[in-house]
């Protein structure tokens, strides 16, 4: 398979990054805010799935070693650097003094989502690490099964991901699962879907119909998102009913990807 960079994927990442910024600028719980949160983080996991190569990892241990170097080590390097800066600088140290070291260290080393040191966005790295691990195991088990079996297995993963917070009372010491293991379940759904979308060249097959599909997916994502649902957040495992959540997420993702693919065409990009 060609190792050349995909311009459409790079453009889609740019669009998704813009939505991240816009999502943090728009007033919380505004309609646009809820619409962006319906699909912008799922889009990043979907895009990661489009470049996912399970054949690179002969075993789960190989995956842990390789992806640990590229995802978990950067998480600690950036987080501990930020923690050092916030400890030294008096202005930034105020939040640490207010919340206490126990709170700060718990969120860094247990939850995998630094708080009060301005690097909370790094939750994506451990979530991507475990989403990839889940996806690798899922593909090892189901990739060669009949498509109906795969659909049932992916549906089961969807339900597990959206219902995982019901297991929180069973955790003896903390309020949630560690290291974004819960967020990674839903993230794995998008990663697997991205993998199959790329492998089957689904986007390429949709391209002749972009004039209809892009506005259709935009309207559909808005309908299943802010129209029918409340605020959702993959990071916090805050979901609505699975048909609404995944309907809004996948519709928004395909609208974004088809727009990016259209923008990557030579006649437009040049």
Language-model-detected regions and their locations in the chain:
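Alpha-helical transmembrane segments and their immediate juxtamembrane cytosolic regions
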Residues: 1-270
């Amino acid at each position: 398979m060609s190792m050349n960079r995909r311009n459409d994927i790079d453009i889609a990442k740019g669009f998704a990054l813009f939505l991240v910024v816009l999502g943090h600028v728009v007033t919380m719980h505004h309609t646009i805010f809820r619409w962006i949160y319906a699909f912008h983080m799922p889009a990043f996991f979907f895009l990661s799935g489009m470049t996912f190569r399970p054949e690179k990892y002969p075993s789960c241990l190989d995956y842990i070693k390789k992806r640990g170097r590229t995802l978990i080590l950067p998480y600690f390097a950036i987080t501990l650097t930020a923690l050092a800066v916030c400890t030294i600088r008096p202005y930034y140290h105020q939040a640490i003094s207010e919340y206490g070291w126990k709170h700060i260290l718990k969120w860094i080393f247990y939850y995998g989502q630094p708080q009060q040191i301005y690097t909370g966005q790094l939750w994506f790295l451990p979530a991507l690490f475990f989403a990839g691990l889940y996806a690798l195991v899922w593909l090892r088990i189901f990739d060669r099964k009949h498509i109906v079996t795969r659909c049932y297995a992916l549906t089961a993963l969807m339900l597990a991901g959206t219902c995982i917070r019901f297991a929180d009372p069973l955790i003896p010491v903390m309020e949630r699962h560690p290291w974004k293991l819960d967020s990674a379940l839903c993230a794995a759904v998008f990663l697997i879907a991205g993998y199959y979308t790329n492998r089957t060249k689904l986007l390429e097959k949709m391209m002749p119909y972009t004039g209809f599909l892009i506005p259709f997916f935009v309207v559909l994502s808005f309908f299943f998102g802010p129209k029918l649902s409340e605020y959702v957040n993959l990071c916090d495992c805050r979901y609505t009913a699975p048909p609404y959540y995944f309907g809004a997420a996948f519709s928004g993702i395909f609208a974004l990807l088809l727009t990016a693919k259209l923008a990557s065409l030579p006649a437009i990009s040049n």
